[in-house]
Amino acid sequence: MTTEFTHHSALSDAVTKNFEATLQTLTELVAIPSIAWESHDLTQVDRSAEAVAALATKAGFNNVRIERATYTTADGTEKQGMPAVIASRPAAEGYPTILLYAHHDVQPAGNLDLWDTEPFVATRKGDRLYGRGAADDKAGILVHLAALAALNETLGEDFKLGVKLFIEGEEEAGSPSFVSFLNTYREELSADYIVVADSANWRAGVPALTTSLRGVASGDIEVRVGSHAIHSGMFGGPMLDAHTLMAQLLATLHDATGAVAVEGLHRAPEPELEYAEADFRNDSGILDTVPLAGTGSVASRLWTQPAISVIGMDIPSIATSSNTLAVVSRARISTRLAPGDNPENAHRALAEHIKAHAPHGAQATYTAVDSGMPFATEVDADGAQTALDAMRAAWGLEPVQTG
């Protein structure tokens, strides 16, 4: 199937004409520090939702609403999720409905000393706009709304397609109420196709469609070697501290090449697209002296193989350290799952690995914390083919399919 785009030139002109105004709107959204973590000012997430709702109304959506959903934490506490924006415009008879997804919450700014600009002041440098959330994912919101503005201007507001909007407010915080939200607002969000504007570019100037995503299985590891803290000068030597044992245990998660060594985790077939090692090194900033971990193509290591990262540890800082021999150590790992795997299988495999590799007779346990299914698009389906055709028409280039 090849789609004909009869209004391509007019749509392109409309997007170009409105680009600077769209950029200004993005700048205004970036100025709102919408961090959905409880340690931050959550009223800013409300501000962000209100700003997005106003933009949705301006774009011609009907029934624009800011909604939340309740969810239950692991300890049984019922909590309310962060505000999301949903909106809709009905489809004409016989026309499909498309759901547009992005998120308006952002990551914390982190260490301000590492910023060359103010995190929440969008700063333009050449063809780049720097600011927290400028790319992830407030640009995604504006991509959707700018496209609708171009369609409204070119075809008129009654262009027959049904369009729904779902702008989440807690994606960077792990989407704790996401499943509950989908169940609560299933009818409002039902659609024939979903367009997600929240992924990485393949390369500047090259159109790309993300056709697969790895899943996630996060969990906490605890290593215990004694009943209470003791003095390292009196007992160190015959007794290893829990942090040292944790380091030994974490090292078993990978083999000598750096490939994941946990049995039972799925690996998907090699992707067709090549990702040159030189490009990965340039994109990631990895030191020249550090070899790339794992085996297989770089693309497969990124998209179709599992990956495990240590993302947190409960350990005293150097500033607060003392001559204490720690008897318990905790770490959180994030495991990315290949398409075709599932979090339940991954948590089980990780728990078995941790138990089997407990060092020096220490007690080692794994507790599941977070789960997310991997995903693979049916690339031959009409929606995916239409998206690829649209990219060819807009860019004049063959789009690539990435993970």
For the regions a protein language model found, what residue spans apply to each?
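Fold-level recognition of mixed alpha/beta catalytic cores in primary-metabolism enzymes, strongest
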Residues: 134-293, 297-306
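Generic non-transmembrane alpha-helical segments
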Residues: 14, 21, 25-28, 51, ...
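An extended, acidic, His-containing surface patch that forms the Zn2+-binding/catalytic region
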Residues: 93-94, 203-204, 259-320, 324-328, ...
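Oligomerization/assembly interface segments of phage tail-like spikes and tubes
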Residues: 218-223, 327-336
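Structural motif
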Residues: 96-99, 128, 164, 192-194, ...
